[in-house]
């Protein structure tokens, strides 16, 4: 990892500020710039975070405008409007499209060589919009995708099986949203297919249990929002993990939102799929062997995203 790494975060809300906190704790940057339309909010977050500088690796955290982001290695976009009660998904997309039309050109102007990491929702749609607005190669425009959803899936499986979450391997793929799919056919524990492990461990693993776990994963954000108003800690850790893979050139396989160009029979859509992530962004997309039901569900997820995109482009 290079010594002097600069990261800029656009958006000083819950997700943006939590992301900066996670990046600081991970020692992943020597400079972090926070930009927000509310300059006082950005300045306040930078001050608060900077006051903890004595407890982490050397890092300068400051607020600024787009000019101050110049020379960033990675620009993380967390800004955007939140969905209001009664507001349709399409209305939210159009609102955020207009916001991104003001953000992305400014980011590109000062950071022509940066990797753009989109976190704002709906993340797959906004990552595609960022790709189109930026003119960057697809490898350098990435969405947080289903990295968090995959972590939620592994966690819930670990709770059921009473196994360390790090020893459970599986993916959530597709849209970061209601049409996402769980790859049960690929789920393995201790090198065993999940069904084999169920038999070996005498744990319940029937269709109803699988559906409940999948449903809990899919609706996890709604449950958290109902309890505390917003989700931000776990997504910040997911973003930190993606940034880590990029800066350390790990070639890690993460379900980031990547541009599909024929993989899985899907074209011209950004969605969460297993991708090799390294110093230059997305190095490659891995086509994992899904069963027929999973393939069909992934295709349906892509159609859902495509319909939203067709309303804009």
Curated annotation (Swiss-Prot):
What's the Enzyme Commission number for this chain?
Answer: 1.1.1.27
Q: Which reaction does it catalyse?
A: (S)-lactate + NAD(+) = pyruvate + NADH + H(+)
PROSITE patterns hit by this protein: L_LDH
The main location class comes to cytoplasm
Query: In its keyword annotation, does this UniProt entry include Transmembrane helix?
Result: no
Report TM segments. none
The pathway noted for it is: Fermentation; pyruvate fermentation to lactate; (S)-lactate from pyruvate: step 1/1
Q: Print the keywords alphabetically.
A: Allosteric enzyme, Cytoplasm, NAD, Oxidoreductase, Phosphoprotein
GO terms of molecular function? L-lactate dehydrogenase activity
Q: CDD domains this protein is in?
A: LDH_2
Where do the annotations place substrate binding?
Answer: 83, 89, 121-124, 149-152, 231
Which residues are modified to Phosphotyrosine? 222
The entry's beta-D-fructose 1,6-bisphosphate-binding residues are 154, 169
Question: What GO cellular-component annotations does this UniProt entry give?
Answer: cytoplasm
Q: How is its activity regulated?
A: Allosterically activated by fructose 1,6-bisphosphate (FBP).
Q: Which residues form a coiled coil?
A: none
Show the active-site residues. Answer: 176
Subcellular location per UniProt equals:
Cytoplasm
According to its UniProt entry, the function of this protein is described as: Catalyzes the conversion of lactate to pyruvate.
The Swiss-Prot or TrEMBL record describes its family as follows: Belongs to the LDH/MDH superfamily. LDH family.
Write down what this protein is called.
L-lactate dehydrogenase 1
| Originating organism | Clostridium acetobutylicum (strain ATCC 824 / DSM 792 / JCM 1419 / IAM 19013 / LMG 5710 / NBRC 13948 / NRRL B-527 / VKM B-1787 / 2291 / W)
